[in-house]
Amino acid sequence: GKTICLDYSSINIAKRFHIGHLSTTMIGHSLRRIYDFLGYKTVGINHLGDWGTQFGKMICAYKLWGNEEEVEKGGVNELVRLYVKFHEEAEKDPALDDQGRAWFKKIEDGDEEALRIFNWFKALTLRDTERVYKLLGVTFDSYAGESFYNDKMDRVINELKEKNLLTISEGASIVDLSEDNMSPCIILRSDGATLYATRDLAAAIYRHDTYHFDKCLYVVAYQQDLHFRQIFRVLEKMGYEWAKDCVHVAFGMISYEGQALSTRKGHVVYLEDLLE
């Protein structure tokens, strides 16, 4: 039989599951059930948003204002409260942002305390989100998210270098896509930091190596259209025939009272409130 990978839901760690996640989750889940029914082998992937400086900020907020018992009990709600507080305080005291960055650097460097707290936040988020998935009847085979690809990006960068696809532009390493009428795909920032594109290239290659998919569907909002066109084109340029089997299943965003949803601004409708 043929194998279909479906990348859907893809929640962010330390944020509540809100109504904006409903489209990707239910469209992905529905497609999966249809493919299952048709006899395909399906692999459901929840590509967790579990990397970035915001986790340094979360730890910083926890160290300053958090309480272990309250976080353990309150779970994601308490983490969101701390996150919002951090942003309020950082507006008055910009030095907090530096502290947040320093904590994230600790996570990157494998500091024991930082990793312990980071993994705990992750476990709490999955615990709370699992309740929502149960209500919806949604399951996944893999929760390999952004951090999973940390050690898989060098391979991509080296391969791009070997194939002479990388160009330096304003200090950043890019793949030039001007002949495809697209803006460049940025692989490394000028400070050497990797970006979403680097991770998504690593993820696509890993998925093909691991699952040997016949199709890989990305159920992600239409705003990411250019991003995926860039990724698929770069994979083609790298010589991966299967790039044509990667498909972005785009959908419209849910807005509420005419505004986009933002956890940071507290402008959000939570799914559990809706379902209950």
Predicted regions and their residues:
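NTP-dependent nucleotidyl-transfer catalytic core
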Residues: 1-276
